[in-house]
Amino acid sequence: MANVVVVGSQWGDEGKGKIVDWLSERADVIVRYQGGHNAGHTLVIDGVSYKLSLLPSGLVRGKLSVIGNGVVVDPHHFVAEVEKLRGQGIDVTPDVLRVAENAPLILSIHRELDAMREGSNSGLKIGTTKRGIGPAYEDKVGRRAIRVIDLTEPETLRPKVERLLAHHNSLRRGMGLEEIAVETILTELTSVADQILPYIDQVWRVLDERRKAGARILFEGAQGALLDNDHGTYPFVTSSNTVAGQAAAGSGLGPTAIGYVLGITKAYTTRVGEGPFPTELNDEIGEFLGTKGHEFGVVTGRKRRCGWFDAVIVRQTVRTSGINGIALTKLDVLDGLEEIKICVAYKLDGKRIDYLPSSMGAQARVKPIYETLPGWSETTAGARSWNDLPAQAVKYVRHIEELIGAPVAMLSTSPEREDTILVTDPFHD
């Protein structure tokens, strides 16, 4: 049985929540391996909506759910999200939820620093959620982070906090902010320790044992591959690696355990926040896609930018993430359009190119080269087989497969999990 990594193939918001929920019914273990509570997703089960941003989707189905070491954990948000799920009737206990003991913590100083930087009139606005994700990763790389396991050792926690604040207070002085006392952070941590410590574990061992026992493991990615810190539209990216390779590093399970990479791909393109977007539509078609597709962020409520499908960036993600097949989502949003365009290449300084360049200036200058396909007037909403789809919709899907170099393994035609056409089961070897 193959273990499956789910990765967004664009800039996030591709509809991973529904697909992960669909797959989680077939999985035994669900793992979050990167990011924090900055990327949300909505699950709709029996008419009830569950909005998650930190906890793995498998909790809603009672499956063992793991927060890996690649995730930065806001302990107060963790507690709040657990309580919210319990309020919706979901049983959340250490039997079904584990947190990597070596996961770094997000603290109030990270949130304040994030907001201060993003709100500054000087410098480059990245479009962060101001939830402290980036500064927490900075401290991890700088080897001064407070990790979950540190909450179990009060005798070593104080010197670690002192070292952390030596760095942060120097930053705060430069920004004209009041310095933070060691006791303030210690109180912040000890106030929540008893609520998070029952869930901690050496998750790499848990996952290795489950793998050897034949469990199906689903790795749940957040955001999208074009927000990857290395392979995305830098600097308009997130602070972690979002490509499929991070599933191994962010969970402690070796890369040979990964059997199938599923790229979640929207039938058009959206982006939240700043950064290049070659196929963006600032016209009535863009408004149509945003309105019909309900394109507003789960976490921030921010309106998403919308545009035509960009085969260049998805083809690039297929390569950088080793995608075996895609789950194409929101095809129904395109219903009713007379014609549909697909970006097949870019023009950069008069030259045709088939990739997204790495430099910020070049990314801003690329112009899309489009192919135009006829649309369809019939509905695709709720389709559960290829025979239910209009002929032109099938042609659109097949053309996407050709352009990106990967087959459609799943096709989603509404937010409801049953409205899914399965072509290839990712869990089958």
Swiss-Prot record:
GO biological process terms held by the UniProt record: 'de novo' AMP biosynthetic process; IMP metabolic process
Residues that coordinate or bind GTP: 12-18, 40-42, 304, 330-332, 412-414
Subunit relationships: Homodimer.
SUPFAM superfamilies linked: P-loop containing nucleoside triphosphate hydrolases
Residues the entry annotates as binding Mg(2+): D13, G40
Cofactor(s) of this protein: Mg(2+)
Catalyzed chemical reaction(s): IMP + L-aspartate + GTP = N(6)-(1,2-dicarboxyethyl)-AMP + GDP + phosphate + 2 H(+)
Residues reported to bind IMP: D13, E14, G15, K16, N38, A39, G40, H41, T129, R143, Q223, T238, R302
Name of this protein: Adenylosuccinate synthetase
CC per GO annotation: cytoplasm
Compartments, record wording: Cytoplasm
EC class of the enzyme, as a word: ligase
E.C. designation(s): 6.3.4.4
Pfam family, any one: Adenylsucc_synt
Known role: Plays an important role in the de novo pathway of purine nucleotide biosynthesis. Catalyzes the first committed step in the biosynthesis of AMP from IMP.
